[in-house]
């Protein structure tokens, strides 16, 4: 009679057919039945079930981390991405604003340099007239107790007006100087409304002008006099 465990004959006859016994299933300690006569082990919690899968029991449930829809990074990556985009946009805006401020500052500095260069050239031309060998002067008392002096150089064909003690013009008005071309008034520039003492290089050549006058005009000046002169002076002839 064959063995009930390995299904092999009891004899050792060479004519017997040997068959390999089916190996018993391997069982882990938690799945292996207890030896006869031993106390039954206390039931274990479900999470402590077989970890090898030998008895068909599933592995303990592992909590899964949720991932964003795009599958990149841990949960909340979308929110982080939005904050990153906002921060990047703020940096770009700040850089653009800084660039605009830098351009404005550069323009202001350039304008200041141009004004300084223009004032320097104006002072140089004024000095050339005052120091010219043929420069002639004429002085006169002006309205309100002010004093005026005009300097003319025929070689430079230019004239300079020096004022001291000039009262300020009315609000919104300026003093405008005119060449007197045989009765026709030709604009020769504006005086500084904030300066009581001023030196003005008259705009344009003297040519045939015989004198000059000063009127009160709207801010920015006028193409021709709009008020009576507050001062009239003749140019020196000798």
Swiss-Prot record:
GO biological process terms, semicolon-separated: regulation of translation
Highest taxon of source: Bacteria
Low complexity compositional bias, start-end: 16-31
A Pfam match: RskA_C
GO MF terms, alphabetically ordered: sigma factor antagonist activity
Location of the region described as Disordered in the Swiss-Prot/TrEMBL record: 1-51, 214-238
GO cellular component, one term: plasma membrane
PANTHER family found in the cross-reference section: ANTI-SIGMA-K FACTOR RSKA
Protein name: Uncharacterized protein in phr 5'region
Organism: Streptomyces griseus
